[in-house]
From Swiss-Prot:
Gene3D superfamilies: Urease accessory protein UreF. Keywords: Chaperone, Cytoplasm, Nickel insertion. The lineage of its organism: Bacteria, Bacillati, Actinomycetota, Actinomycetes, Mycobacteriales. Its main location: cytoplasm. The keyword DNA damage does not apply. One of its GO terms (cellular component) is cytoplasm. UreD, UreF and UreG form a complex that acts as a GTP-hydrolysis-dependent molecular chaperone, activating the urease apoprotein by helping to assemble the nickel containing metallocenter of UreC. The UreE protein probably delivers the nickel. This is Urease accessory protein UreF.
Amino acid sequence: MDLDADFLLLHLSDSALPTGAFAHSFGFETYMDAERITNAEEFQDWLKVLLKVQLTSSDALAMRMFYATPTVSELKRLDERLFAGTPAREIREANARMGTRMAEIVAETYSVPLIVEYLELIQHRELSGHPALALALATHSAGIDVDRAIHAHLTATVSSLIQNAVRGIPLGQMAGQRVMFAMREHIGAAVKRSANLDEIDFCSGDPGLDISQMVHETQRARLFMS
């Protein structure tokens, strides 16, 4: 067992990592405002769609594609495609902020090939930054299996959104934990599903999710930045 690799994975996929994820609902606040998400069950239904469609075809597939071709040119291509394939401005900005912060944390704490170059490209505004790619750089460098890396990233993302729902809807703490436990099989299924996707599936969207994320830009009263 490589304890250093395990530590890196646990550290960088911790939902409490200071990337700013606590400030984003990724559109569920729009459904809250419309009173379509009012309880744990309704939130869980939304979360399953986000995971199955957006997170699987964007974050998970991008990580898998980088692992297949771990080069600077592929990193640039994936970063650009993730940005271009995200319709909602707030989500593009959220990914850029969290991706930049993740890259800064990795560069500060671990010796990872390409991460300094990635961070410089972000800082020079040549790339936008994305947390899934910054994590993939670190996990690939540590020799962590791609499925484990994707599973950890999706778990952390789901956990962050549940924490935001607990204080936003609000939900009880135990209700949030029940949602987290119920999502375990859906996270595993998303990892497996991403292995069967290819280039044509990259950044596949769901009209309802995309529209809710764009509507949030003009929502008058809100707790979250996206």
